[in-house]
Amino acid sequence: METEQPEETFPNTETNGEFGKRPAEDMEEEQAFKRSRNTDEMVELRILLQSKNAGAVIGKGGKNIKALRTDYNASVSVPDSSGPERILSISADIETIGEILKKIIPTLEEGLQLPSPTATSQLPLESDAVECLNYQHYKGSDFDCELRLLIHQSLAGGIIGVKGAKIKELRENTQTTIKLFQECCPQSTDRVVLIGGKPDRVVECIKIILDLISESPIKGRAQPYDPNFYDETYDYGGFTMMFDDRRGRPVGFPMRGRGGFDRMPPGRGGRPMPPSRRDYDDMSPRRGPPPPPPGRGGRGGSRARNLPLPPPPPPRGGDLMAYDRRGRPGDRYDGMVGFSADETWDSAIDTWSPSEWQMAYEPQGGSGYDYSYAGGRGSYGDLGGPIITTQVTIPKDLAGSIIGKGGQRIKQIRHESGASIKIDEPLEGSEDRIITITGTQDQIQNAQYLLQNSVKQYADVEGF
């Protein structure tokens, strides 16, 4: 069902050259990206949108979407959904899809941003609470944007390439950030590819990806994502999982700077640095680091105050997640070994040796705590080690202390640990819920610690 949006309209293609034929220099630049495609071949592109953006694509009385269909002789649809996400589907040849995207991107909302005197003086606010900024207020196309491409899970390998070579090449050649999420969208075989950068670069990257996957047949069962089945507890790369409403930026992508998306130092494949940990201090259930370890008094300075509690050292004999019914570490739960009842994390860290503290604070030998894991969640080669999966079990009445209101707590744990975390619904007649954690060993250990800490802090307070 197509809804009306009275204010957003596309620029006139005939009067605004920016959205008509591309200038010659742009065409020359694109010659650097060689593509052996049949330009007349019809392909389908599916983009995951926020529901609030659907109206901008559709337009008042369907004006915008009808113009796209007519002007480009393409199939364009944005089916209705009851959740916070909708899917933009475009069927046309690849070059035409690129032109349509360039016309749509400036109308999309950037995200939530708290109003400021500067913002309110430049933009008309419908509400004094929050304002949704629009890419359209930028001049030209010199701004950063992002799109979420949906692909069948069997096509992911063609984008990643052997040992990540293809995705690295895509990042470098198109100067974009690319994240391919491990977990499929709820009740589907689709995975999200998150692409960020300048609009022209993002579009070019999508065109190359379409060319890659159009040459590969889908393997196995195909169940396209239906946004009506969106699930807050899944970490699939959707807006509910990625968006940080306080800052209006997607978690894992950096704030915009003069040079576009910030890059990590050479040798990291051109991936972006994650947002500063300080942005999340006021949400963290952990209020600062533990006291400095013996012989490392320098950690007590101002720099250390911005560090979180470190992840635990390697397990001393089993899984870190073991709860009693009150949500505190117990001897065993469901056959999993944890800390004994008198050895909680509070007491355990007091016994750490200086080498354990150093390992916890400097997991990669650098100074301070390394957050590169958080920015690389779900993308190949960003994780610093082999990907493994583990499962832990908790009483179902403790799940709320982990998930939090609107899923905020589990979102934060995912972000801070860098791991993919999925909480299954309890089986019929069962009193337990299974938590599946995927990531590197360090990420899994950190996630387990954060999950345990969340239960310890909130189970009694919130009456679970």
Swiss-Prot record:
It is found in: Cytoplasm; Nucleus, Nucleoplasm; Cell projection, Podosome. The modification N-acetylmethionine is found at residue 1. GO terms for cellular component: anchoring junction; cell projection; chromatin; cytoplasm; nucleoplasm; nucleus; podosome; ribonucleoprotein complex. It comes from the Eukaryota. The modification N6-succinyllysine is found at residue 219. GO terms for molecular function: DNA binding; mRNA binding. Residues 236-273 are annotated as: RNA-binding RGG-box. The modification Phosphoserine is found at residues 36, 75, 116, 214, 216, 284, 379, 420. Residues 1-276 are annotated as: Necessary for interaction with DDX1. There is a cross-link at residues 34, 163, 422 (Glycyl lysine isopeptide (Lys-Gly) (interchain with G-Cter in SUMO1)). The modification N6-acetyllysine is found at residues 34, 198, 405. InterPro entries: KH_dom, KH_dom_type_1, KH_dom_type_1_sf, ROK_N. The modification Phosphotyrosine is found at residue 380. Residues 59-407 are annotated as: 5 X 4 AA repeats of G-X-G-G. Sumoylated by CBX4. Sumoylation is increased upon DNA damage, such as that produced by doxorubicin, etoposide, UV light and camptothecin, due to enhanced CBX4 phosphorylation by HIPK2 under these conditions. Ubiquitinated by MDM2. Doxorubicin treatment does not affect monoubiquitination, but slightly decreases HNRNPK poly-ubiquitination. CDD domains: KH-I_HNRNPK_rpt1, KH-I_HNRNPK_rpt2, KH-I_HNRNPK_rpt3. Sequence repeats lie at residues 54-76, 59-62, 245-250, 257-260, 267-270, 295-298, 324-329, 399-421, 404-407. The modification Omega-N-methylarginine is found at residues 316, 377. The modification Phosphothreonine is found at residue 39. Residues 19-37, 276-285 have a biased composition (Basic and acidic residues). Residues 54-421 are annotated as: 2 X 22 AA approximate repeats. Pfam families: KH_1, ROKNT. The keyword Transcription regulation applies. One of the major pre-mRNA-binding proteins. Binds tenaciously to poly(C) sequences. Likely to play a role in the nuclear metabolism of hnRNAs, particularly for pre-mRNAs that contain cytidine-rich sequences. Can also bind poly(C) single-stranded DNA. Plays an important role in p53/TP53 response to DNA damage, acting at the level of both transcription activation and repression. When sumoylated, acts as a transcriptional coactivator of p53/TP53, playing a role in p21/CDKN1A and 14-3-3 sigma/SFN induction. PANTHER family: KH DOMAIN CONTAINING RNA BINDING PROTEIN. This is Heterogeneous nuclear ribonucleoprotein K. The lineage of its organism: Eukaryota, Metazoa, Chordata, Craniata, Vertebrata.
